């Protein structure tokens, strides 16, 4: 015969499960926004964003962006990643499943399928911007001097791309029933689960995502700058005039001398070149009579 203590330890058959049973081996609902979860998220943001600073110093010096351009580029990406992060936190608490596992599944889908969708979205928007000639909406270009309106417009476009990406990932999550996949069931410590979901795995994946997406957002500006530089060089070559000067030789033949019109060659050098070329005599052909030289 068991006493009240035994019944309390097992929990009543018709009542709610005990606190130990509900919390053992799984994150509780809302655990992602508790104090420990918020601390891990802040630490992750600082560490992951520092990879963008490392990327800037790894760029060649002649292609390295000024700090203001770098900040405008990376701030768009930071805002987009914050949107994805809080969307994942919200979606993780919608069901009764383990929120840590759901967050991790959402995050991994964002890092795989989502990366492809972001690339397609950036390319599609770039084509539309070039077609409509919206110069202020070209990713990575903010005018000279810098215009805040250009940054706001590009940031809005990038957020639209992120909304599209998150919507597709959410549909994939629902169709394939990935919410039933329990990736973290073998781990029994909820705090360790939270650290894996919020810090350890996102650190490596976010570093890669920040690095790749930064190339998406800055590529158009670098390409356009190279095209403008190439066009300027082409114009400078086409703009230089070329003239011909004729000099009579002793044999009353004419030799053509090509002289560039960039005024870098002095007149004395031109005359010296003419004197050097005029003494050249043409080779006289020998006359033949009946096949024998005369």
UniProtKB/Swiss-Prot annotation:
Full protein name: Store-operated calcium entry regulator STIMATE
Region Required for localization in the endoplasmic reticulum, residue ranges: 241-246
Gene name of the record: STIMATE
Species the sequence originates in: Homo sapiens
Free-text domain note: The GXXXG motif may mediate oligomerization. The C-terminus is necessary for its localization at ER-plasma membrane (ER-PM) junctions as well as for the store-dependent rearrangement of ER-PM junctions.
Transmembrane segments annotated in the record for this chain: 29-49, 69-89, 102-122, 156-176, 194-214
UniProt lineage: Eukaryota, Metazoa, Chordata, Craniata, Vertebrata
Role of this protein: Acts as a regulator of store-operated Ca(2+) entry (SOCE) at junctional sites that connect the endoplasmic reticulum (ER) and plasma membrane (PM), called ER-plasma membrane (ER-PM) junction or cortical ER. SOCE is a Ca(2+) influx following depletion of intracellular Ca(2+) stores. Acts by interacting with STIM1, promoting STIM1 conformational switch. Involved in STIM1 relocalization to ER-PM junctions. Contributes to the maintenance and reorganization of store-dependent ER-PM junctions.
Summary of subunit composition and partner proteins: Homooligomer. Interacts with STIM1.
Tissue and organ expression note: Widely expressed.
């Amino acid at each position: 015969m068991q006493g009240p203590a035994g019944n309390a330890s097992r929990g009543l058959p018709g009542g709610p499960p005990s606190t130990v049973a509900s919390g053992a081996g799984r994150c509780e609902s809302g655990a992602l926004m508790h104090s420990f979860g918020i601390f891990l998220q802040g630490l992750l943001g600082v560490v992951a964003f520092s990879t963008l600073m490392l990327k800037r110093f790894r760029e060649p010096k002649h292609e390295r962006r000024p700090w203001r351009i770098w900040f405008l580029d990376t701030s768009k990406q930071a805002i987009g990643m914050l949107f994805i992060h809080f969307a994942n936190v919200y979606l993780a608490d919608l069901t009764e499943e383990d929120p840590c596992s759901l967050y991790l599944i959402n995050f991994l889908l964002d890092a795989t399928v989502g990366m492809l969708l972001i690339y397609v979205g950036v390319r599609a928007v770039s084509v539309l911007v070039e077609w409509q000639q919206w110069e202020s909406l070209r990713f990575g270009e903010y005018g000279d001097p810098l215009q805040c309106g250009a940054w706001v417009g590009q940031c809005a476009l990038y957020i639209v791309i992120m909304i599209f990406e998150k919507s597709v990932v959410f549909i994939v999550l629902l169709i394939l029933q990935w919410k039933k996949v329990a990736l973290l069931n073998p781990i029994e410590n909820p705090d360790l689960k939270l650290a894996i979901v919020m810090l350890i795995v996102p650190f490596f994946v976010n570093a890669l995502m920040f690095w790749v997406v930064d190339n998406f957002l800055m590529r158009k500006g670098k390409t356009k700058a190279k095209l403008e530089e190439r066009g300027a060089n082409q114009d400078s070559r086409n703009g230089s005039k070329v003239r011909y000067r004729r000099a009579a030789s002793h044999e009353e033949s004419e030799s053509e001398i090509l002289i560039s019109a960039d005024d870098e060659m002095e007149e004395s050098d031109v005359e010296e070149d003419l004197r050097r070329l005029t003494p050249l005599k043409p080779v006289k052909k020998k006359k033949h009579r009946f096949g024998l030289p005369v």
